[in-house]
């Protein structure tokens, strides 16, 4: 048996096409979705990520606003910029590119973003809402993973899913989304003593641990669907290349479907950032309309 390779690029293109259609509908109603991206410093990887996000936004018809601050900027300067963007009704989404310089508190900066404009889904109000099953802006990578799983598996109800990793960005929200889809969910991490044995029972494995090729075929139940969130740069025969947390070639003979690295989850993350931006624009427009109607009713 050779696993089906899940094409994240093609899936992301379909999501972005839908986003583009939604943007056109909003623009016809006088609403122009706008995404503000804040980049502090000039980290090379962050530069690439920001460039890709802005390019995808422009392709989808979303107005992008890039705000650059020097690496030596103070926490207060970052917070002041966030406050300015929070107050700007023409800005629907705010993305703070991570990591921040070491002298800054990431959590404090993320908490300063208006939850309704928090298109990364990192604000505690959105995190709490997700855990309660409320309709909130959810983290982009787990949302993209869920889309790939639903396209691949259909109904996920009753499936046993194992999430490897418990980060706030991927592991925890991934587990919450799988629970919402009525999966039985197990989270394993660096302190788990039986991680491999638990993975061997899983219908779905989501790897987000940040260790290159950590999981090979011996970890997998035959026929498991494998989502590899890991992005690790390694030296291979004198060349630098990207690999995931899954030993891809080794796992192909056991899994029924698997995402590659690159070309799997990565494109979905950016696609769902655009989707969140459009969702935020729509929700803000509805809120403003409701507020205007309420004012009219009270004064007319």
Swiss-Prot record:
Q: What is its EC number?
A: 1.5.1.5, 3.5.4.9
Record keywords:
Amino-acid biosynthesis, Histidine biosynthesis, Hydrolase, Methionine biosynthesis, Multifunctional enzyme, NADP, One-carbon metabolism, Oxidoreductase, Purine biosynthesis
Does the keyword field hold Hydrolase? yes
**GO cellular component term, pick one:** cytosol
GO MF terms listed in the record are: methenyltetrahydrofolate cyclohydrolase activity; methylenetetrahydrofolate dehydrogenase (NADP+) activity
Task: Tell me the InterPro entries matching this sequence.
Answer: Aminoacid_DH-like_N_sf, NAD(P)-bd_dom_sf, THF_DH/CycHdrlase, THF_DH/CycHdrlase_cat_dom, THF_DH/CycHdrlase_CS, THF_DH/CycHdrlase_NAD-bd_dom
Q: Which Pfam families does the UniProt entry name for this protein?
A: THF_DHG_CYH (PF00763), THF_DHG_CYH_C (PF02882)
Against PROSITE patterns, the record matches this protein to: THF_DHG_CYH_1 (PS00766), THF_DHG_CYH_2 (PS00767)
Could you name the domain of life of the organism this protein comes from? Bacteria
Keyword Ribonucleoprotein carried by entry = no
- State the reactions this protein catalyses: (6R)-5,10-methylene-5,6,7,8-tetrahydrofolate + NADP(+) = (6R)-5,10-methenyltetrahydrofolate + NADPH; (6R)-5,10-methenyltetrahydrofolate + H2O = (6R)-10-formyltetrahydrofolate + H(+)
User: What pathway does the UniProt record associate with this protein?
Assistant: One-carbon metabolism; tetrahydrofolate interconversion
Q: Which CDD domains match?
A: NAD_bind_m-THF_DH_Cyclohyd
Q: Which residues bind NADP(+)?
A: 165-167, 190, 231
Give GO BP annotations, semicolon-separated: L-histidine biosynthetic process; methionine biosynthetic process; purine nucleotide biosynthetic process; tetrahydrofolate interconversion
What task does this protein carry out? Catalyzes the oxidation of 5,10-methylenetetrahydrofolate to 5,10-methenyltetrahydrofolate and then the hydrolysis of 5,10-methenyltetrahydrofolate to 10-formyltetrahydrofolate.
Q: Which family does it belong to?
A: Belongs to the tetrahydrofolate dehydrogenase/cyclohydrolase family.
Q: How does this protein assemble?
A: Homodimer.
Q: What is this protein called?
A: Bifunctional protein FolD 2
């Amino acid at each position: 048996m050779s696993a089906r390779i899940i094409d994240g690029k093609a899936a992301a293109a379909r999501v972005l096409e839908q986003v583009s259609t939604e943007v056109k509908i909003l623009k016809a109603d006088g609403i122009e979705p706008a995404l503000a991206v804040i980049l502090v410093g000039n980290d090379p990887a962050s530069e690439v990520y920001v460039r890709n996000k802005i390019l995808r936004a422009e392709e989808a018809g979303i107005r992008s606003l890039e705000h650059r601050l020097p690496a030596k900027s103070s926490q207060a300067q970052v917070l002041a910029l966030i406050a300015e963007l929070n107050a700007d009704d023409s800005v629907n989404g705010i993305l703070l590119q991570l990591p921040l310089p070491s002298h800054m508190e990431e959590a404090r900066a993320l908490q300063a973003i208006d939850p309704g404009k928090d298109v990364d889904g990192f604000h505690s109000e959105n995190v709490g809402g997700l855990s309660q099953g409320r309709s909130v802006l959810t983290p982009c990578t787990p949302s993209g993973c869920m889309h790939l799983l639903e396209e691949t598996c259909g109904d996920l109800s009753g499936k046993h899913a194992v999430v490897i990793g418990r980060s706030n960005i991927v592991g925890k929200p991934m587990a919450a989304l799988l629970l919402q889809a009525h999966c039985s969910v197990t989270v394993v991490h660096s302190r788990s003593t039986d991680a491999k044995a638990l993975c061997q029972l899983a219908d779905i494995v989501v790897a987000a641990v940040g260790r290159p090729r950590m999981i090979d075929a011996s970890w997998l139940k035959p026929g498991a669907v494998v989502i590899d969130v890991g992005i690790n740069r390694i030296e291979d025969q004198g060349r630098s290349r990207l690999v995931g947390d899954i030993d891809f070639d080794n796992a192909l003979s056991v899994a029924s479907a698997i995402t590659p690295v690159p070309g799997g989850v990565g494109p979905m993350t950016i696609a769902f950032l655009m989707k969140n931006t459009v969702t935020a624009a729509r929700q803000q427009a509805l809120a403003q309309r409701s507020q205007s109607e309420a004012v009219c009713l009270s004064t007319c």
